[in-house]
Amino acid sequence: MNPKGICRLFVSVFIASCVLNLSSVPNAFGTDSLSVSGCSVSYVGYLRDLAWEYERRTGIKIYVRGGGTVGGLENLREGKSDFAATCRNRIEGDPEDVEFVQVAWDALVFIAHKSNPVKNISLEDARKIYFAEITNWRQLNGKNAPIKVFISRTTKSLSGIEASLRNMVLNGKSPVENPNLKFLPSGGIVEQIIEKSPDGFAASGFTSARKRDVNMLKLNGISPTRENIIKKKYPLKRPLFLVVPKNSGPEVKKFINFILSKEGQRFISALGVVSLLDIK
């Protein structure tokens, strides 16, 4: 896909997400509803389904929005949501007086277009892509085409994916900016762009990428499957959190207690997500 096509797709995805958000504006202070926003990996991977199940059981409506870790934490700070979802640990600048509660496991995965003949990548080659030392798919035994790299990033803080990428792959460093590196506002948009970009490459979370029409690359010959993550064969495992104010009301605490219960964790596991029960 050429740059103009990518831009048009981005605009379409952004407008569509805005329409969806406006169609379900939450009442963050209602007694019969809760609201959560944040990490796209959590939103796509388990949070929507969990919210529907919780409403079915309790009658409490949970309004769920994606938009990324940074946006979710900002909404929480500004009182626009009752809690937030994130796929990274706490960093400097995050809201104070909150708790990061781990609710599931995820793994950082590398994704490409379905048609891409490259099916495996080494951790070292992935690192070289982000440092602009590998710039063409031909260098990975693929076709002669530039590697178009997409990363979720905002101006306010580190996204969950980039934080994991820096900590687990890039030895604490930032990706090297170059003409083939594009920044997008959320991981959900990155995944949708990869679905449409034959030369695209990105890091994402297993929990959401498994539900997209993308090619999840093997890493050092190991497939990113739920079984391999549980058995600790696939590396780059990372936690998924819900971020809750320390002074949360009783309904928020009830929801957190449900998700941490054996029943809640079994429901998460049944969705195909790696639950806390799956990894001891």
Language-model-detected regions and their locations in the chain:
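N-terminal secretory signal peptides that target proteins for export/translocation
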Residues: 1-7
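Short linear, low-complexity motifs centered on an aromatic residue
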Residues: 5, 25-26
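Bacterial N-terminal signal peptides
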Residues: 9-23
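Exported/periplasmic ABC-transporter solute-binding proteins
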Residues: 28-280
